[in-house]
UniProtKB/Swiss-Prot annotation:
It catalyses: tRNA(Lys) + L-lysine + ATP = L-lysyl-tRNA(Lys) + AMP + diphosphate. Belongs to the class-II aminoacyl-tRNA synthetase family. Keywords: Aminoacyl-tRNA synthetase, ATP-binding, Cytoplasm, Ligase, Magnesium, Metal-binding, Nucleotide-binding, Protein biosynthesis. Homodimer. One of its GO terms (cellular component) is cytosol. The lineage of its organism: Bacteria, Pseudomonadati, Pseudomonadota, Gammaproteobacteria, Enterobacterales. Mg(2+) 2 binds at residue 422. One of its GO terms (biological process) is lysyl-tRNA aminoacylation. It is an enzyme of class 6 (ligase). CDD domains: LysRS_core, LysRS_N. PROSITE patterns: AA_TRNA_LIGASE_II. This is Lysine--tRNA ligase.
Length: 506
């Protein structure tokens, strides 16, 4: 973790002097009763103004005499005697203000405005016009200080150089960094787009417990908390899957949930302990239906949010307009490690040898299915750049998926990859209660053997299956990783507003 470098003595002294000066200005404001007013109302944002009026000439604007009210943070100011130009930043972007001493109430310009600081939040009212350079501006007839900023803008409005500060003080990052603001606007649009897509297909949004007595629905190490009133250890959920399928048992044929999951694991450019998932369950469907739905979802979001089905990412481009590639797990291994013999992947000892040759540490508890999966992850996963579905996952690593009718050693499951990363996981659900109970027991044995990510035995879920789960397909998509792809972000911390960080220095 990077730490902020200590400030040079001169810089620290300059900052302390500025902080002191700003606080003295606030004291003066309090004495006048003008500190922190709450009666100013804006009627437009900067992006609305630019969208509506950028195309008009100054003569047309003057003839229309359009008066608007805006509010935002003062980012720059150029004082030129009796007149000034201000850049005001709001949620939509920036708009220029023209401030003239003679157009404001007496004393406002010299006694107030010129004493305000960059970072202060202002309210402005005036008529639209365009400067000689063609920039849409507001000729202010009223200007008010709404909030006094007691600290200066980061790095004199040149952005934040320190990545750690960007994450730890996200509010500063959002003030200074246009790209960050745009990333989180796109994230919001993606979330809204997913909800619209699902509702249009008759899915019902639901909420399931975030604290669970038995963590389930995924293989991961959970966070543990304690319920004082019940005197009971509980777990932050690692997945909502088992609760969502209980709802399908109850008769809700199409359900989805967008919410946080928690996994007590490491932090990396692709992993955050608290992350957002969308999970859906659809009765009377199988994993092939989910492949079609996933392809349609990504294609729709790319077009609606970004305006194109071709999405740039680093030096690559992901094409969501073309049919997505589909490979079985073993086909992918053979494609990217052609020296592999297909027959070797059906032999335990030979698969062990392949895994060891790849530098994989083979655990005693692994069966053939886990070995093949590890070989796939080592040899093929990083090469799956364009949207690709990998199918035929071994039953050993798919404790909740339905076995394939032709080969019970594999399941009707897929994972969805883009840019060498897993983005989604879907399968035909296991609805055989007895088979599910047996697989839970296998997971318990694995946990007893030292696998702390193996699942617990969930007796109530087995009971729910005994009441009858219709043929069902389920899908989970990592929202954070999806946003990374759509915003050309290369670390998950860039797409989570407040990512997990080690405690910083004071």
């Amino acid at each position: 973790m990077s730490e902020q470098q200590p400030q040079a003595p001169d810089a620290a002294l300059e900052l302390n002097n500025e902080l002191k000066a700003r606080r003295e200005k606030l004291v003066a404001l309090r004495a006048t009763g003008l500190a922190f007013p709450n009666d100013f109302r804006r009627d437009r944002t900067s992006d609305q103004l630019h969208a509506e009026f950028d195309g008009k000439e100054n003569e047309e604007l003057e003839a229309l005499g359009i008066e608007v009210s805006v509010a935002g943070r003062m980012m720059t100011r150029r004082i030129m005697g009796k007149a000034s130009f201000v850049t005001l930043q709001d949620v939509g972007g920036r708009i220029q203000l023209y401030v003239s001493r003679d157009d404001l109430a007496e004393g406002i310009y010299n006694e107030q405005f010129k004493k305000w600081d960059l970072g202060d939040i202002l309210g402005a009212r005036g008529k639209l016009f365009k400067t000689k350079t063609g920039e849409l501006s507001i000729h202010c007839s009223e200007l008010r200080l709404l909030t006094k900023a007691l600290r200066p803008l980061p790095d004199k409005f040149h952005g934040l150089a320190d990545q750690e500060t960007r994450y730890r003080q996200r509010y500063l990052d959002l003030i200074a960094n246009d790209d960050s603001r745009n990333t989180f606007k796109i994230r919001s649009q993606i979330m809204a787009g997913i909800r619209s897509f699902m509702v249009d297909r008759d899915f019902m949004e639901v909420e399931t417990p975030m604290m669970q007595a038995i963590p389930g629905g995924a293989s991961a190490r959970p966070f543990i908390t304690h319920h004082n009133a019940l005197d009971l250890d509980m777990y932050l959920r690692i997945a909502p899957e088992l609760y969502l399928k209980r709802l399908v048992v109850g008769g809700f044929d199409r359900v989805f949930e967008i919410n946080r999951n928690f996994r007590n694991e490491g932090i990396s450019p692709r992993h955050n302990p608290e992350f957002t998932m969308m999970e859906l369950y659809m009765a009377y469907a199988d994993y092939k239906d989910l492949i079609e739905l996933t392809e349609s979802l990504f294609r729709t979001l790319a077009q609606d949010v970004l305006g194109s089905t071709v999405v740039p990412y680093g030096d690559q481009q992901f094409d969501f307009g073309k049919p997505f590639e589909k490979l079985t797990m073993k086909e992918a291994i053979l494609k990217y490690r052609p020296q592999t013999d297909l027959a070797d992947l059906a032999d335990f000892d030979k698969s062990v040898a392949i895994a060891q040759s790849l530098g994989i540490k083979v655990e005693k508890s692994w069966g053939l299915g886990r070995l093949v999966t590890e070989i796939f992850e080592e040899t093929a996963e990083a090469h799956l750049i364009q949207p690709t579905f990998i199918t035929e996952y071994p039953a050993e690593v798919s404790p909740l998926a339905r076995r394939n009718d032709m080969d019970p050693e594999i399941t009707d499951r897929f994972e969805f990859f883009i840019g060498g990363r897993e983005i989604g996981n879907g399968f035909s659900e296991l609805n055989d209660a007895q088979d599910q109970a047996e697989r839970f027991l296998q997971q318990v044995n694995a946990k007893d053997a030292g696998d702390d990510e193996a699942m617990f035995y969930d007796e109530d879920y087995v009971t729910a299956l005994e009441h009858g789960l219709p043929p069902t397909a389920g899908l989970g998509i990592g929202i954070d990783r999806m946003v990374m792809l759509f915003t050309n972000s290369h670390t998950i911390r860039d797409v989570i507003l407040f990512p997990a960080l080690r405690p910083g220095s004071k």
